[in-house]
Curated annotation (Swiss-Prot):
The keyword Membrane does not apply. This is Endoglucanase 21. The gene is GLU9. It comes from Oryza sativa subsp. japonica (Rice). Residues 1-24 form the signal peptide. Its main location: secreted. Keywords: Carbohydrate metabolism, Cell wall biogenesis/degradation, Cellulose degradation, Glycoprotein, Glycosidase, Hydrolase, Polysaccharide degradation, Secreted, Signal. The keyword Secreted applies. GO terms for cellular component: extracellular region.
Length: 529
């Protein structure tokens, strides 16, 4: 009896020591040590409320924001109130907004159970619907889509809260005579992906989204052209460098996933060569370059099995090969160094210096998703160029490493998610956050006055734009927290959107491991007794 009690005491001490060491290794966040992915998920969804345009709802949680853009579209005789500001300015750019909704919807569709278990189901649905409601509004006719509200040049000349803005709210559209296959295709993808998310909770709304998605895809495919050729004002901000081929394939594959209709898959197969789907082997995934994402969607079709004609199977296999090229590039396992993504000494994937964090967060999402697809299909490895192999566990580990880098596991010890951890950017390049809230001081702030009084001040922003992921450090892991350093301190909606899925997944994994450890501990104690 004494021996048994001694053993029990030893086990108890061991458990306490293990718990203490885990907490010390992390930041004592309440998740049992390490990073608090649940808090990061919560903050990420909160960020979208800071970016809202239009009439804010009664349950708005970001209280320093107010109604804005209430006359958007009025000059053109259309209702374009609502949607999201993409970053730290007050323009509504349709292409990155639609991409944000696609990624947020993909995250929700892929990690629905994990998001719900973290208590964020309602918030993710609200974040998606705020964007898709606007995208539906912007699609005013079968072959007409409003792609921008506001003018980047005049907007950037001023530093004003959204609630005060006096800059141009001119709206710009694409139509038959002024095509925009890229923005039409991305908007179709966003609405198709969102229709999957709302299928159970709001079936009528889901069908509405799908109807608009199908019309937009048909419009974009029938009247081809780059939207920045039709809307010159967007070129300096969101030029479509990759063209529209990736968006058309992306939209077709999302419509296939949403409807199950063979015709959309036939399109993705038939147009694979012409639109670059099986020709482009890329090392980045972003609001502009969608090839890696669509290649992964096509690979998923193949991995799910089914009776595919030989020609279909061969093309889908080409898609999978290109998808795995991207994933191997993130791991640095392709044979040619130029075929891999550069990595900083601190471990961050590095593509380019302007808002590099968008490439990091998108990579983390695609790595996470594909590791799950491998597991679900019974596979375990992918083949990289040159013959090297990589496992699903390696993909997942790289995804987690990038997520942890974002949250503070980096040489600077800085969380690049605003409001998370002890050290995070305090001078985010964000008009609304950098100026006193209109609720605290309702006095009008003029265009140039905002620069003089708020932009150039050295202190921290008066409002914390929690959940925003800023552009992040350079290729040497260096970061300068200054409002004028927009390449590093400006946050964008498409930086945070993919991390909603990643953080939900990592939190679920952490909780599952914690439960397993607790069960093992209880089992050990029972054996001792």
């Amino acid at each position: 009896m004494v021996a048994a009690m001694t053993m029990c005491a030893a086990v108890a001490v061991l458990l306490v020591l293990t718990s203490t060491m885990a907490a010390a290794a992390g930041d004592g966040d309440g998740d049992g040590g390490g990073f608090d992915y649940k808090k990061a998920l919560h903050s990420g969804l909160l960020y979208f409320e800071a970016q809202r345009s239009g009439h804010l709802p009664y349950n708005q949680r970001v209280r320093w924001r107010g109604h804005s853009g209430l006359a958007d579209g009025l000059q053109q005789g259309v209702d374009l109130v609502g949607g999201y500001y993409d970053a730290g300015d007050n323009v509504k750019f349709g292409l990155p907004m639609a991409f944000t909704m696609t990624m947020l919807s993909w995250a929700a569709a892929e990690f629905w159970d994990e998001i719900a278990a973290a208590g964020e189901r309602r918030h993710v649905l609200e974040a998606i619907k705020w964007g898709t409601d606007y995208l539906v509004k912007a699609h005013t006719a079968a072959d007409e889509l409003w792609a921008e509200v506001g003018d980047g040049d005049t907007d950037h000349y001023c530093w004003q809260r959204p609630e005060d803005m006096t800059t141009s709210r001119q709206a710009y559209k694409v139509d038959r005579d002024n095509p925009g296959s890229d923005v039409a295709g991305e908007t179709a993808a966003a609405l198709a992906a969102a229709s999957i998310v709302f299928r159970r909770s709001k079936p009528r709304y889901s069908r509405l989204l799908l109807r608009h998605a199908e019309q937009l895809f048909d419009f974009g495919d029938r009247y081809r052209g780059k939207y920045d050729s039709s809307i010159g004002e967007v070129r300096a901000y969101y030029a479509s460098v990759s063209g529209y081929g990736d968006e058309l394939l992306w939209a077709a594959l999302w419509l296939h996933r949403a409807t199950g209709r063979r015709g959309y898959l036939d399109y993705a197969v038939a147009m694979a060569d012409e639109l670059g789907g099986v020709g482009w082997a890329v090392t980045e995934f972003s609001w502009d370059v969608k090839y890696a994402g669509l290649q992964i969607l096509a690979a998923k079709v193949l991995m799910d099995g089914g009776d595919h004609p030989a020609a279909h199977a061969a093309t889908l296999e080409q898609y999978r090969s290109k998808a795995e090229h991207y994933l191997c590039a993130c791991l640095g396992k392709n044979a040619a160094a130029g075929d891999n993504v550069n990595r900083t000494a601190g471990g961050m994937l590095f593509v380019r210096r302007w808002n590099n964090m968008q490439y990091v967060t998108n990579a983390a999402f695609l790595l996470t998703v594909y590791s799950r697809y491998l597991r679900d299909s019974g596979g375990d490895t992918i083949r990289c160029s040159g013959g090297a192999m990589a496992t699903g566990d390696e993909l997942a580990a790289m995804a987690r490493a990038q997520a942890d880098y974002v949250l503070g596991d980096n040489p600077a010890g800085v969380s690049y998610m605003v409001g998370y951890g002890r050290r995070f950017p305090r001078r985010v390049h964000h008009r609304g956050a950098s100026m006193v809230s209109h609720r605290a001081d309702g006095r009008f702030v003029g265009c140039v006055q905002g620069y003089d009084r708020w932009f150039r001040r050295g202190g921290a922003n008066p409002n914390v734009v929690a959940g925003a992921i800023v552009g992040g450090p350079d290729d040497r892991d260096r970061f300068r927290d200054s409002r004028d350093n927009y390449m590093q301190t400006e946050a964008c909606t498409y930086n945070t959107a993919p991390m909603v899925g990643v953080f939900a997944h990592l939190h679920a994994q952490k909780m599952a491991a914690r439960t397993a450890n607790n069960n093992a501990d209880r089992s050990m104690i029972k054996r001792v007794d």
